[in-house]
Amino acid sequence: MSDTEDNKNKQTTRRDFIVLTASSVAAVGAACAFWPIIDSFNPSADVLALSSIEVDLSNIAIGQTVTVKWQGKPIFITNRTHDEIAAARAVKMSELIDPERDEVRVKAGHDNWLVTIGICTHLGCVPLSHKGEYNGWFCPCHGSQYDSSGRVRKGPAPLNLAVPPYIFISDKKIRIG
């Protein structure tokens, strides 16, 4: 090999390194320049504060379901009877399309309160409460039936009614979101 060929290989390698380094610095600079623009798409603090709601449970009678709106979605809040709780806990997991124990769907110590997102998991219709074979919810669009724990028992719905994030602020008040 001649000195000229060795020099070309070294220059090519050196050139590749310089191009790679310059490209990396440019990419990091572009990311830093665009970060404020990307970050502006996140919701502001006042919008995040409105993303949670507080619901007073004291006016909901035993056996009654109330619907509230949270983030544009209907939320079913049900004050279940002892019979509804016992029936939901007696169901065998093998009978469920989407097996989930009743105890997992409610907060410990507040077994009578069931909070679910009121949207059918099949195609997004709003089910009717205290309807159907299982005394839970019935979706009039395609016939999905949910039990008193919001678990799908029959029909085309693949999943149980979703449980939104919520906490008990007191025995008679919850915060959803």
Swiss-Prot record:
EC number: 7.1.1.8
GO molecular function annotations of the record: 2 iron, 2 sulfur cluster binding; metal ion binding; ubiquinol-cytochrome-c reductase activity
Cofactor section: [2Fe-2S] cluster
Keywords linked to the UniProt accession: 2Fe-2S, Cell membrane, Disulfide bond, Electron transport, Iron, Iron-sulfur, Membrane, Metal-binding, Translocase, Transmembrane, Transmembrane helix, Transport
Chief localization: membrane
Residues in Rieske domain copies: 88-175
Bilayer disposition of the protein: Single-pass membrane protein
Domain of life of the source: Bacteria
The keyword ATP-binding is assigned to this record: no
Subunit: The main subunits of complex b-c1 are: cytochrome b, cytochrome c1 and the Rieske protein.
Protein name as it appears in the record: Ubiquinol-cytochrome c reductase iron-sulfur subunit
Organism from which the protein derives: Rickettsia prowazekii (strain Madrid E)
